[in-house]
């Protein structure tokens, strides 16, 4: 079964972008390559149970097992040694990516407190978009009663768009609620 958002991309977004940016081939149209979810855990240094809780939360949100990220180098000021676990991340591709993006745009973002739309300035210059969420309980998969601590997470949407303008057009047509 093709995810709803992917179907919308293929039937509505691709023809519209081909017309708007005058692409010669369908392969030139920007597409979403992957979505990376990351939870950075500063408290994992003292509290090793925080890592397990964050892993469980991210697994519930993403639908696949996250990988533990480790410190690349030692930083004495943060009491971090090289190789210490300091976060969890997961990379979504394919159907899971499409269904997550659908849930993010239609369920999660509208549930945020004081939500008026996402900023247009969060593009990185190469058509990729980043969103930071302050709490994981906005996801319907997370049981509010079982949460030990509120943790934020980063969502990075990686596209094949060469610049921010085309990346913005892609996400806007897919239904990302930008504040204009």
Swiss-Prot record:
Organism superkingdom: Bacteria
InterPro entries reported in the protein's UniProt record: Ribosomal_uL5, Ribosomal_uL5_bac-type, Ribosomal_uL5_C, Ribosomal_uL5_CS, Ribosomal_uL5_dom_sf, Ribosomal_uL5_N
Family matches, as Pfam families: Ribosomal_L5, Ribosomal_L5_C
GO MF term list: rRNA binding; structural constituent of ribosome; tRNA binding
BP terms from Gene Ontology: translation
The UniProt record lists the keyword Ribosomal protein: yes
Similarity section: Belongs to the universal ribosomal protein uL5 family.
Function according to Swiss-Prot or TrEMBL: This is one of the proteins that bind and probably mediate the attachment of the 5S RNA into the large ribosomal subunit, where it forms part of the central protuberance. In the 70S ribosome it contacts protein S13 of the 30S subunit (bridge B1b), connecting the 2 subunits; this bridge is implicated in subunit movement. Contacts the P site tRNA; the 5S rRNA and some of its associated proteins might help stabilize positioning of ribosome-bound tRNAs.
Assembly and oligomerization: Part of the 50S ribosomal subunit; part of the 5S rRNA/L5/L18/L25 subcomplex. Contacts the 5S rRNA and the P site tRNA. Forms a bridge to the 30S subunit in the 70S ribosome.
Name listed for the protein in its UniProt record: Large ribosomal subunit protein uL5
